[in-house]
């Protein structure tokens, strides 16, 4: 391995919008990151069905096309 050509690989603390925090590693310049979903609150991992609406997209779709009646 050549010296001096590889990026600095350091720990970064990640905070989710649900309040969960964990530490991972990054080659980026930041020391702290914020994410919208993590394994503690993502529907795939929790088994709970919920809609993750980013930027009102679901509401805009329902307004435009309406909800499907059963």
UniProtKB/Swiss-Prot annotation:
Q: Tell me one GO biological process term.
A: translation
Q: What keywords appear on the UniProt entry?
A: Metal-binding, Ribonucleoprotein, Ribosomal protein, RNA-binding, rRNA-binding, Zinc
GO CC entries:
ribonucleoprotein complex; ribosome
Q: Which residues bind Zn(2+)?
A: 16, 18, 38, 41
Cite the cofactor comment.
Binds 1 zinc ion per subunit.
Q: Which Pfam families match?
A: Ribosomal_L31
The GO terms describing molecular function are:
metal ion binding; rRNA binding; structural constituent of ribosome
Q: Does the keyword Membrane apply?
A: no
Q: Which cofactor does it need?
A: Zn(2+)
Q: What do we know about how this protein assembles, alone or with others?
A: Part of the 50S ribosomal subunit.
Q: Which HAMAP family does its entry note? A: Ribosomal_bL31_1
Similarity field: Belongs to the bacterial ribosomal protein bL31 family. Type A subfamily.
Tell me, in a sentence or two, what this protein's role is: Binds the 23S rRNA.
- Entry protein name: Large ribosomal subunit protein bL31
């Amino acid at each position: 391995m050549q010296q001096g050509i590889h990026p600095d690989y350091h720990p970064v603390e990640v905070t989710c919008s649900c309040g969960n925090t964990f530490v991972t590693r990054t080659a980026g310049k930041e020391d702290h990151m914020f994410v919208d979903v993590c394994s503690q609150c993502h529907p795939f991992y929790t088994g709970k069905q919920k809609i993750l609406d980013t930027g009102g997209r679901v509401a805009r779709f329902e307004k435009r096309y309406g909800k499907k009646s059963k």
